[in-house]
Curated annotation (Swiss-Prot):
GO cellular component: 3-isopropylmalate dehydratase complex
Source organism (scientific name): Aromatoleum aromaticum (strain DSM 19018 / LMG 30748 / EbN1) (Azoarcus sp. (strain EbN1))
Pathway field: Amino-acid biosynthesis; L-leucine biosynthesis; L-leucine from 3-methyl-2-oxobutanoate: step 2/4
Pfam family, any one: Aconitase_C
Protein name in the entry: 3-isopropylmalate dehydratase small subunit
């Protein structure tokens, strides 16, 4: 997993509450478990005016010009600004895969669905929860300013707005350490490879009958 330390990135405002995982990545794209290649189908039913299918070339598909990610001013955004209950609905790890594959590293909203929230950390995304008034102000500034950017520093747990105001945010210490070091579940396990190997060798010596071919 790619470590996350800090980011100075463009913001895209998705001004919708209760965005569910089927909107983030529709069900027909869940057949693959490669963890990559989902970016072109992120928010597929909102970004395009036709019906998307797996393996389809999205370059020439008809786009919805009103959708935020199709607007030139938000091109290359790495921070997604959201509303309440983002990531609700069915549990699918493909949702954070699609967001990360598109290029997002940070999500900022007033609340996130629990399973989605935890899946973000496991896949290199930083979901940040802020009070609703702070979210409202970020939406106002973002929509009023072309190329609106925020600086997010995980080590200090701060967001710096273009006007210089600093906003503090909370993050679980364990999740923070994992993101800073790029540790996913596999990486965490491999950190204890020597202890696991020692345990397995002792178990084989103590209980050889478990390992009869």
């Amino acid at each position: 997993m790619k470590p996350f330390t800090e980011l100075n990135g463009r913001v895209a405002p998705l001004d919708r509450a209760n965005v569910d995982t089927d909107a983030i990545i529709p069900k027909q794209f869940l057949k693959s478990i490669k963890r990559s290649g989902f970016g072109p189908n992120l928010f597929d039913e909102w970004r395009y005016t036709d019906h998307g299918e797996p393996g389809q070339d999205c370059v020439n598909r008809p786009k919805n010009p009103d959708f935020v990610l199709n607007q030139p001013r938000y091109e290359g955004a790495q921070i997604l600004l959201t509303r309440d209950n983002f990531g609700c609905g069915s549990s699918r790890e493909h949702a954070p895969w699609a967001l990360e594959d598109y290029g997002f590293r940070v999500l900022i909203g007033s609340s996130f669905a629990d399973i989605f929230f935890n899946n973000c950390f496991k896949n290199g995304l930083l979901p940040i929860v802020l009070p609703a008034p702070e979210i409202d102000e970020l939406f106002r500034q973002c929509e009023a300013t072309d190329g609106y950017r925020l600086k997010v520093d995980l080590a200090t747990q701060t967001i710096v707005r273009p006007d210089g105001k600093t906003i503090a945010f909370e993050v679980d210490p364990f999740r923070k350490e994992c993101l800073l070091n790029g540790w996913d579940d596999i990486g965490l396990t491999l950190r204890h490879a020597d202890r696991i190997r020692t345990f397995e060798e002792k178990r084989r010596a103590d209980h050889p009958y478990y390992f009869v071919a």
